[in-house]
Amino acid sequence: MPATKERTYNETEIAERLKELPGWYFEDGWIRRVYKTDGWPTTLMLVNAVGYLAEAAYHHPDLTVTWGRIIVKLQNHAAGGITDKDFELARKIEEVALWRPQGGALEGTPNKWVRPGDPK
């Protein structure tokens, strides 16, 4: 039985879906997110977290890594565009990258850590 090609989204549909993912944007065929960090150690921890999620999902983003920033780019190469896999992995990355303990025994770090904000 031949494999079914995954549904890809057009730019209008992508823009609508990205409303659910503040900070993510569509550019040059990729959905993207810039995460700013408080420096190299935090950047590396975030890269490792993204790598773990990508490997567990078996869907791998392109990453750009600098001292205080990581850029995540997602698209489904096999499908030739943006698919549900991209949105699902983006949502999980966002959840993990911006998670902070609230209302429990965990105190959380006093550092700024990963900063949401300007996507570019």
For the regions a language model picked out, list residue spans one by one:
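Long, contiguous binding/interaction regions
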Residues: M1-K120
